[in-house]
Amino acid sequence: MGQKIHPTGFRLGVIKEHRSRWFADPARYPALLQEDDQIRTYLTKQLSSAGLADIQIERKADQIDLEIRAARPGVVVGRGGSSLETLRQGLQKELSALAGQSPGSRGGGERTIRINVVEVTRADAEATLLAENIAQQLERRIAFRRIVRQVIQRAQRAGVQGIKIQIAGRLNGAEIARTEWTREGRIPLHTLRADIDYAEHLAHTTFGIIGVKVWVFKGEVLPGQERHEQKFPLQQPKRRQQRRRPTFEDRSAQEA
């Protein structure tokens, strides 16, 4: 079960929280859910160069609170907060346009939008940023084994306890699509107290679409307790073992 279900959904209510935290009447729930999707789509498109890691949404009466976790918060804020104001105005227009199409929704201009930007301290330990980085390098036609090896080394230096990367598609322009993956450290998907960060991304190459999936194990968290950031990276293996190249497994025959 832990191998198939989404790692975040599997741990909701135990060590993970919902990305959208609000309650609504059953009649308005579909419209507000559609607004959340529109907000995430708009911010992801506008902040593509800011290293966007996560977006948290809270609603209080006629107020929307957004928490944006980004690796480069300066890009989000802009000089003197100009970029934040542009984002706020753009979101108001998007919600106003959506309100005219969705029955049961209130006008987008009636809500106050507050944006809080939080800097990601360990960008190399965020699965979303790692998957996006892998996809960008694949689009530049860099060999996937070299990309995976570099990403794993960066994640290990960031202090993660385990990382797994899976890439599927026409790798290196091969005629037959296949799936290859590698893992370093532990990825306990069945353990509910294990803090597993999961992300997936698509790389649009000249040979077609390549799918990228990343699992990052950041440590174990007891229910009801906050996870403390690890101050020091884990002890690295000996130098001779560190040079060992990661092994890949071909899953194309199993999936067929």
From Swiss-Prot:
Span list, region Disordered: 227-256
Compositional bias of kind Basic and acidic residues: 246-256
CDD domains for the chain: KH-II_30S_S3
GO cellular component, one term: cytosolic small ribosomal subunit
Keyword Cytoplasm recorded: no
Domain of life the protein comes from: Bacteria
RNA-binding in keyword set: yes
GO molecular function, one term: rRNA binding
Keywords assigned by UniProt, alphabetized: Ribonucleoprotein, Ribosomal protein, RNA-binding, rRNA-binding
InterPro entries, per the entry: KH_dom, KH_dom-like_a/b, KH_dom_type_2, KH_sf_prok-type, Ribosomal_S3_C_sf, Ribosomal_uS3_bac-typ, Ribosomal_uS3_C, Ribosomal_uS3_CS
GO biological processes: translation
Residue span, KH type-2 domain: 39-121
PANTHER family: 30S/40S RIBOSOMAL PROTEIN S3, SMALL RIBOSOMAL SUBUNIT PROTEIN US3C
The family this protein is said to belong to: Belongs to the universal ribosomal protein uS3 family.
Function: Binds the lower part of the 30S subunit head. Binds mRNA in the 70S ribosome, positioning it for translation.
Subunit annotation: Part of the 30S ribosomal subunit. Forms a tight complex with proteins S10 and S14.
Protein name: Small ribosomal subunit protein uS3
Organism of derivation: Synechococcus sp. (strain JA-2-3B'a(2-13))
